[in-house]
Amino acid sequence: EICEYFAQSGSFRTFKAAQSQLKELEKIGYIPVIENVSSENGYNYIVIVGPFENRSQTNNARENLRRLNMDSLEKRSCKKI
């Protein structure tokens, strides 16, 4: 199994709000993406940073985001080999 790790840095109701955070993350050197998701609570756009090779790199990124007052979640995507 091969896994990639990501940090979800925000959930937003509007694309414009997600884009604002994306631009902030680009300013500090990340290459974030916006994903359109369906949710029951109305948050339709998430901002994702990564992929990272391991949880340690993901945790470092999450700590950097925390210093910028951005909460984040760890996300993992695994594929069987």
Task: Give the predicted meaning of each segment.
Residues E1-C3, R13-I81:
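Extracytoplasmic
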Residues G10:
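Conserved beta3-strand ATP-binding lysine motif
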